[in-house]
């Protein structure tokens, strides 16, 4: 049963929460997101989300949120059952959950005014090199926008991209950023 007198505590810093929000926005807004284009049409409010499946598409999930609500949709059976027996392979790849989530969110937010996610002090937006994952250097041919905690920025990329490899000195100084401290938003 649920207790209504539980003690709460903050699990994430506001900075980490904001970076995760930016990362999960890509699921809906990026052209390679697993739920691309399925954000609710709610006065232009941003959304974030995460798709999920159990082994062999036996359970399908989508969890998403806006500045007002966070909701989850689960599609499955009490006993494990291959969803591709009743849904097409395309539908079984969480699209059914995503579409249900979108329809629900559009209804519950239909009359709500626009609201933005709060920004967080201590988070900065920077270009990063899509080949190395480091902050973009002068010679990086492919860049995207990322969000980082200001106190935990990755090094700047100094790869020799023409050869496709980093020098020994580059490799020694290069560390891929901690995913919990890094937000990624592709152009």
Predicted regions and their residues:
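Ser/Thr/Gly/Pro-rich low-complexity, disordered linker/stalk segments of secreted
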Residues: 162-187
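A penicillin-recognizing enzyme superfamily signal
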Residues: 1-170
């Amino acid at each position: 049963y649920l207790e209504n007198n539980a003690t709460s505590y903050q699990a994430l810093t506001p900075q980490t929460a904001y970076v995760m929000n930016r990362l999960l926005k890509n699921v809906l807004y990026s052209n390679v997101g697993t739920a691309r284009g399925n954000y609710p049409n709610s006065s232009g409010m941003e959304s974030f989300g995460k798709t999920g499946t159990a082994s062999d598409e036996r359970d399908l999930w989508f969890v998403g949120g806006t500045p007002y609500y966070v909701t989850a949709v689960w599609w499955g059976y009490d006993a494990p059952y291959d969803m591709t027996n009743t849904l097409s392979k395309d539908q079984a790849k969480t699209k059914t959950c995503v579409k249900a989530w979108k329809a629900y969110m559009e209804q519950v937010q239909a009359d709500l005014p626009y609201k933005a996610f709060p920004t967080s002090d201590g988070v900065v937006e920077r270009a990063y090199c899509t080949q190395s994952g480091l902050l973009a250097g002068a010679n990086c041919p492919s860049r995207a926008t990322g969000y980082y905690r200001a106190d935990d920025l990755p090094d700047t990329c100094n790869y020799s991209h023409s050869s496709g490899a980093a020098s020994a000195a580059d490799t020694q100084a290069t560390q891929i950023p901690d995913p919990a401290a890094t937000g990624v938003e592709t152009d």
